């Protein structure tokens, strides 16, 4: 028998029967015979033959392929230690940053990334003791460091809601607030705008999404909130015109594709 008993993105509790048959069980589930059950309160995530449950609360648990934002907390001889908001240690080795041959005896790695720098990386591997290996190769902005802007942190399980279907929610926020935004699957979000008031508005919108992520009609509420706040800013002379959702730059297109690829 091959059957899935739940819908994708359905809220489930521990012990919920998710599927039966030749499916693979991912995080937040366990398998008993041919049946897969949930072990946490969370949202069902079905990808191909793999079924997992994304917890509604709790720390970020990384998976290989995740794109994350992180903060450099230590610089070593040939690597950096990175805080990604996980219970486990994350490391970026020099060979996972560049293919260039580096003379480590003569080179201080702080010339590339220093303590406190924010980087954008991909989870390359996780070993048997949960040490996390990162890579910045092929990442937008070459991994960073990301200059200016602000970092906000939300529960990682709320990231899909912030991104929206096909990147719809985050792209709406980016366009209306004219902000550059990078969303990490660990729940860390980098926001930067030339206008401090618009940057503040983007942050307000994202935090509202986190608070109301379980509710219906959220996209319309966020849109209406943004347009209302933008009208106030226009009346105060902070902005000249309310940005159009139809406008799109080449850079936004690149970022939209990147955001869409990160959606779970």
UniProtKB/Swiss-Prot annotation:
Non-catalytic component of the exosome, which is a complex involved in RNA degradation. Increases the RNA binding and the efficiency of RNA degradation. Confers strong poly(A) specificity to the exosome. The keyword Iron does not apply. Its main location: cytoplasm. The gene is rrp4. Residues 244-258 have a biased composition (Acidic residues). Belongs to the RRP4 family. PANTHER family: EXOSOME COMPLEX COMPONENT RRP4, PNAS-3 RELATED. Residues 65-137 form the S1 motif domain. Component of the archaeal exosome complex. Forms a trimer of Rrp4 and/or Csl4 subunits. The trimer associates with a hexameric ring-like arrangement composed of 3 Rrp41-Rrp42 heterodimers. It comes from Pyrococcus furiosus (strain ATCC 43587 / DSM 3638 / JCM 8422 / Vc1). This is Exosome complex component Rrp4. It is found in: Cytoplasm. Residues 244-264 are annotated as: Disordered. CDD domains: KH-I_Rrp4_prokar, S1_Rrp4. GO terms for molecular function: poly(A) binding.
């Amino acid at each position: 028998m091959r059957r899935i008993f739940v819908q994708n993105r359905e809220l489930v509790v521990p012990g919920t029967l998710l599927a039966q048959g030749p499916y693979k069980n991912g995080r937040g589930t366990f398998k008993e015979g041919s049946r897969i059950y949930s072990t946490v309160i969370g949202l069902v995530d079905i990808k191909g033959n793999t079924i997992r449950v994304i917890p509604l609360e709790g720390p970020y648990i990384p998976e290989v392929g995740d794109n994350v934002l992180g903060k450099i907390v230590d610089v070593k001889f040939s690597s950096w230690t990175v805080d990604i908001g996980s219970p486990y240690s994350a490391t970026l080795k020099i060979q996972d940053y560049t293919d260039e041959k580096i003379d480590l005896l003569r080179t201080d790695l702080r010339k590339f990334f220093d303590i406190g720098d924010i980087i954008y990386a991909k989870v390359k591997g996780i070993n048997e003791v949960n040490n996390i290996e990162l890579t910045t190769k092929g990442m937008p902005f070459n991994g960073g460091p990301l200059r200016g802007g602000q970092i906000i942190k939300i529960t990682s399980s709320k990231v899909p809601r912030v991104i929206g279907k096909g990147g719809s929610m985050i792209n709406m926020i980016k366009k209306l607030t004219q902000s550059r935004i990078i969303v990490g699957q660990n729940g860390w979000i980098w926001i930067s705008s030339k206008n401090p008031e618009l940057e503040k508005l983007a942050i307000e919108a994202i935090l509202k999404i986190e608070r109301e992520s379980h509710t219906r009609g959220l996209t319309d509420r966020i849109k209406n909130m943004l347009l209302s706040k933008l009208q106030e800013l226009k009346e105060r002379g902070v902005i000249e015109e309310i940005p159009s959702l139809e406008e799109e730059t080449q850079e936004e297109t690149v970022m939209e594709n990147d955001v869409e690829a990160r959606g779970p």
